[in-house]
């Protein structure tokens, strides 16, 4: 046997050992892809849909890096049947999509729009016809502009009742077939990016004396918005519990985005800083949902700017979920901000934690960066995050509702190079392997994993400059869906019925 042959055998064996498959996960573990209405559907002026706060924001110069909008996006509104076939071809078990509130209620309230109901009924039925389970998100950032204009949207507690009515309508219309509901997607990002930094809709902030935003108050508004979201979530959960649970038997969760924060050093101050960082991101929402109150560190540092729950509200919010959705992409180091200079400069909610988040330690980056500068590839963060959720929150049922990475959309890249997305394959393999370790070694109660995303799509402030999809979208030629190498890889992962030892 030649040395070259031996090396080839060893490499092949190593690849086999490191490979991951459906069979490695617990029975009934769900694999799916995720999307959102605004990023996928397009057809913004069809079906009696009303305008949203994102339609408004994209008209402001400089808010989207390539000056694009999602008026067409990937035209999922017209091509959903084709996209369902793509999911089925890969072997996905589920599809997480969001309902556009403004398709159901174009003015935010009133009588439901029959065309909107018909569209989502057709999408749900198309999924079920292929044996794909719908996981439905009720709010993925696209608030009807009418409610923003009428009373200030999420800054006004009046929205709680309107959201519950919207959720009630969806439960009534779709709940006979939808058994997994997600009330809100990434309320942390919505509150911070929309009301603190002002970079996302509705684009409110006060940092640097209103240089970036016309109006807003970055030190208080994110807390008000988050509080109203928690109360709206709880109201929807209790409405389902009271009116639909017995008959429909569905489950309700929330999708919370969370990085893992690793202490910058072994010093107590950095260990405490990392804990605070987790409190101010994941704990901001999960502590009230599990314990009925905000984390003590938030209460101490935000003071009276942080709304408090009444005894009644605390009981309403506490325990108001059947599963926890986690959107996890990346990990950062957390360093104690001794001097509070960031707070002095910014005077906003995001600096209340007294933490300096950083991707660098001793001149070395925590992980390779994807196309987006915030997305550092750190697979072990998945393991540590799952362990944290288990240990702090009593091992609740968890679904990874988003995980993925992006490539840059370079206009002069060769198509064959773009389609060979080995980096994405490695990303998912490594993150899923760490998730599997958390399940096997730590007993973490994880039930599913959703890839962001099936298709390249419109990525908020990044517009069309990055690509997260398993399928390449040819934006210049009829939005043709072209499979990347990751499609074949996922197909093999999901087709594997026997665990590789």
Swiss-Prot record:
Classification via Gene3D superfamilies: Glycosidases (3.20.20.80)
Signal peptide: 1-19
Residues carrying covalently attached carbohydrate according to the record: 107, 478
One of the GO BP terms on file: carbohydrate metabolic process
Catalytic activity: Hydrolysis of terminal, non-reducing beta-D-glucosyl residues with release of beta-D-glucose
One MF annotation (Gene Ontology) recorded for this entry: beta-glucosidase activity
Annotated a beta-D-glucoside binding sites: 39, 140, 185-186, 329, 402, 452, 459-460, 468
Keyword list, A-Z: Disulfide bond, Glycoprotein, Glycosidase, Hydrolase, Signal
EC number: 3.2.1.21
Highest taxon above the source species: Eukaryota
SUPFAM superfamilies xrefs: (Trans)glycosidases
PROSITE patterns: GLYCOSYL_HYDROL_F1_2 (PS00653)
Entries under Pfam families matching the protein: Glyco_hydro_1 (PF00232)
Disulfide bridges in this chain: 205-213
Coiled-coil ranges (or none): none
Positions of the catalytic residues: 186, 402
PANTHER family from the UniProt entry: GLYCOSYL HYDROLASE (PTHR10353), LP05116P (PTHR10353:SF36)
Homology family: Belongs to the glycosyl hydrolase 1 family.
Entry protein name: Beta-glucosidase 25
Species annotation: Oryza sativa subsp. japonica
Taxonomic lineage of the native organism: Eukaryota, Viridiplantae, Streptophyta, Embryophyta, Tracheophyta
């Amino acid at each position: 046997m030649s040395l070259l042959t031996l090396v080839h055998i060893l490499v092949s064996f190593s690849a086999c050992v490191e490979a991951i498959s459906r069979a490695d996960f617990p029975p009934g573990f769900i694999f799916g892809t995720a999307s959102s209405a605004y990023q996928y559907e397009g057809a913004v002026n069809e079906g009696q849909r009303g305008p949203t706060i994102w339609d408004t924001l994209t008209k402001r110069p400089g808010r989207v890096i390539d000056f694009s909008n999602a008026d067409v996006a990937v035209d999922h509104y017209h091509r959903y049947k084709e996209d369902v076939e793509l999911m089925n071809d890969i072997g996905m078990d589920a599809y997480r999509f969001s309902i556009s509130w403004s398709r159901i209620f174009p003015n935010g309230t009133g009588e439901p729009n029959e065309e909107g109901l018909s569209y989502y009924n057709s999408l749900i039925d198309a999924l079920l016809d292929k044996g794909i389970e719908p996981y439905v998100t009720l709010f993925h950032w696209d608030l009807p502009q009418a409610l923003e204009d009428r009373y200030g949207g999420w800054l006004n507690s009046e929205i709680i009742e309107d959201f519950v009515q919207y959720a009630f309508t969806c439960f009534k219309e779709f709940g006979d077939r939808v058994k997994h509901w997600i009330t809100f997607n990434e309320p942390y990002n919505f509150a911070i990016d929309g009301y603190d930094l002002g970079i996302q809709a509705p684009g409110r902030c006060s940092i640097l004396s209103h240089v970036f935003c016309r109006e807003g108050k970055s030190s208080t508004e994110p807390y008000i918005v988050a509080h109203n979201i928690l109360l709206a979530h709880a109201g929807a959960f209790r409405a389902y519990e009271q009116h639909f649970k017995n008959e429909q038997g569905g489950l309700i969760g929330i999708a919370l985005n969370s990085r893992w924060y690793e202490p910058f050093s072994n010093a107590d101050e950095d260990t405490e800083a990392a804990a605070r960082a987790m409190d101010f991101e994941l704990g901001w929402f999960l502590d009230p949902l599990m314990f009925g109150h905000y984390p003590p560190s938030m209460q101490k540092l935000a003071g009276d700017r942080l709304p408090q729950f009444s005894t009644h509200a605390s009981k309403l919010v506490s325990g108001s979920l059947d599963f926890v959705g986690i959107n996890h992409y990346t990990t950062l180091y957390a360093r104690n901000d001794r001097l509070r200079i960031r707070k002095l400069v910014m005077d906003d909610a995001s600096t209340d934690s007294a933490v300096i988040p950083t991707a660098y330690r001793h001149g070395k980056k925590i992980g390779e960066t994807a196309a987006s500068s915030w997305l550092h590839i750190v697979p072990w963060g998945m393991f540590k995050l799952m362990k944290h959720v288990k240990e702090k929150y009593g091992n609740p049922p968890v679904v990874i509702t988003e995980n993925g990475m992006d490539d840059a959309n370079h206009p002069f890249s060769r198509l064959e190079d773009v389609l060979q997305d080995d980096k994405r394959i490695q990303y998912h393999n490594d993150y899923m392997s760490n998730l599997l370790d958390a399940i096997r070694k730590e007993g973490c109660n994880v039930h599913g994993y959703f890839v962001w995303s099936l298709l390249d799509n419109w990525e908020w402030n990044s517009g069309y400059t990055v690509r997260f999809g398993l399928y390449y979208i040819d934006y210049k030629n009829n939005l043709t869906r072209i499979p990347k190498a990751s499609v074949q890889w996922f197909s093999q992962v999901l087709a594997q019925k026997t665990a590789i030892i």
